[in-house]
Design a protein with these regions (language model features):
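Intrinsically disordered, low-complexity regions enriched in small/polar residues
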Residues: 7, 57, 88, 103, ...
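Residue-level detector of solvent-exposed, low-hydrophobicity positions
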Residues: 31-33, 62, 99, 141, ...
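Divalent metal-dependent catalytic cores for phosphoryl transfer on phosphate-bearing substrates
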Residues: 11-18, 26, 39-162
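Charged phosphate-binding loop/patch that engages nucleotide di/tri-phosphates or the phosphate backbone
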Residues: 166-193
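Short, Lys/Arg-rich amphipathic segments at extreme N-termini
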Residues: 2-21, 31-35, 183-189
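Generic alpha-helical secondary structure signal
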Residues: 9, 28, 99-100, 174, ...
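A diffuse structural propensity rather than consistent per-protein peaks
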Residues: 2, 78, 124, 175-182
Length: 193
């Protein structure tokens, strides 16, 4: 990928994130972490960086607009997504990547789509962006994070299992609903409920 294209994407993403500097720093952290993981695990570093850079491009869209746009663009909305519309930023972000940011690579768009819940049998790029979102350096310290950061460079599947487990626990402890796909991800990567 050409540096001019990457710089243009960075500028567009910064604008899309409503000048939320913390969100932008998180986004850069995910992009850089994705590229590092790609280098370690033998994936395409440019694709990983772009997917990481665009993973939250629909995050600042108000929830009612997320729902309206998903309907308008023919993107299916599950019951849990209606109840927790923030989950739609992944699906809508993949759509934006393709139609606003002109990303033609389906693998990049799929990595954006699945970065929140994960899914069973993810591609390597999907795994990379999913776990990079969890471990990037700007994340506040949460129980088990340092262990996951150590494991991910040796065993990305184990890191996915542990991060999914932590996410499920966090959502349960806070009385939030859990997307069934998060549970399927956890179980596929070795978790036992």
């Amino acid at each position: 990928m050409d540096n001019k294209y990457i710089e243009q994407l960075r500028t567009q993403v910064k604008e899309a994130l409503c000048s939320d500097n913390m969100r932008y720093q998180h986004t850069l952290g995910v992009a850089n972490t994705s590229a590092c993981l790609a280098m370690c695990h033998g994936a395409d570093m440019n694709k990983a960086y772009i997917a990481g850079l665009l993973h939250d491009c629909a995050k600042c869209v108000p929830d009612d607009v997320k729902i309206a746009e998903c309907k308008q663009f023919g993107l299916p909305i599950s019951d849990i997504e209606f109840e927790s519309p923030y989950l739609l930023h992944s699906k809508l972000g993949a759509y934006y990547a393709k139609h606003i940011y002109n990303v033609k690579d389906e693998e990049i768009c799929s990595a954006i789509q699945w970065h929140t819940t994960g899914k069973p049998a993810m591609t390597l790029l999907e795994k990379i962006v999913f776990i990079a979102d969890y471990i990037e350096p700007n994340r506040r310290e949460i129980p088990g994070l340092s262990k996951i950061r150590q494991i991910v460079f040796q065993n990305i599947d184990q890191a996915i299992c542990l991060s999914s487990e932590r996410t499920i626990r966090y959502l349960e402890d806070n009385g939030n609903k859990i997307d069934p796909m998060t549970i399927k991800t956890y179980e596929f990567y070795g978790g036992k409920l």
